Amino acid sequence: MTEVVTWGSGGTPKATESQYFDNGDIPWLIIGDLNDGVVTESQSKITELGLKNSSAKIIPAGTLLVAMYGSIGKLGITGIECCTNQAIAFAKELRGVSTKYMFYYMAMMKSKLISMGKGGTQNNISQTILKSLNVIVPPPEVQDNLVFRIEELFSELDKAVETLQTTKQQLAVYRQAVLKEAFETFKRKSVPERHIADICDYIVDCPHSTPKWVEEGKLCLRTTNFRKGFLDLSKPNYVSNSTFENRITRLRPMPGDVLYSREGAILGIACIIPKGLEVCLGQRMMLLRTGQNLNNKFLMHYLNSPFLNSVITENIGGSASPHINVGDIKKFLIPVPDINEQDQTVQIIESRLSVCESIEQTVDTALAQADAMRQSILKQAFEGGVV
């Protein structure tokens, strides 16, 4: 690698020096700006003074970028003149290889880079690891043919992925339509409404502290685990026994309890703790335990319905971190038909949503296969299989 690429990395101006950032006009890239494509925008900008007093360096448009921290192997090609922080490596000089050829070669090497990552809470790689890689360097015309064929195949794949993503969006719309229709019935019938606080046995906010995470221990939920209608524990997080006990002093969460995200990017999503699961609450969430006159799934579906979405929009506070207060949620009105009608409504909703979920699983499988296909295309390309 060192024979064909000279790697460099950027830096971060001192955060406490406002003159390094205020009214800055130099795009300063962080890993979140990398998009596995051409990067034309940055979340942050720095000033000339910030540039001079840090390790950040101006790099030209057309430069290859590779993430070294966290999202290891995330790529980009600069579409603008900019600088980066130290978490991003950039190709200062390429010898005998084109930028696009190296871009796709590094994309093929992503899984290997991830496996070479080291660290505690966040795995990282270094420039030393990048320099240790071997790279195949065919003649320029072969490189051009490879890039052309890869992009041709990726273009076909992108069209299929776009169709799948559109299907997912349509399924999301259908979900909301099912919930809207189910609860509109009660509006038309003028079914009595009650404040949520009046028909729940317990409504408990989460502890207002960041838990100390550990590799193994008791399960502690984050709002990133929340999906409408269920918990996604594919990426679990754990805390120690003592932290767990401390976080359940207000109320021990039980299977069947309704969880609701009330802050941040994942705002307004309700799910239920499934049977056999012992958990404590992380941050930005609350717990609702229904009484005998309220079906917990009826409450969950109502919290996920368009009716509550509109109420949340009216009551939302904060811009950088949107949130809704527990006190406001307690005052939310919910139609309360008799328990038998609630049970029937839940059955109808879940019968219709089960079809939706089946299709969504098929779509997700196809999307995963598309990602695998990209890697297969890259692997074959650099082994001479697609040209």
Where are these regions (language model features)?
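A short glycine-rich beta-alpha junction/loop motif
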Residues: 68-71, 82-89, 100, 119-141, ...
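Short, well-ordered loop/turn sites that connect or cap secondary structure elements
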Residues: 59, 247, 252-253
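Low-complexity, Lys/Gly-biased intrinsically disordered segments
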Residues: 1-36, 52-54, 192-231, 244-248
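Interdomain signal-transducing alpha-helices
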Residues: 102, 143-146, 299, 303, ...
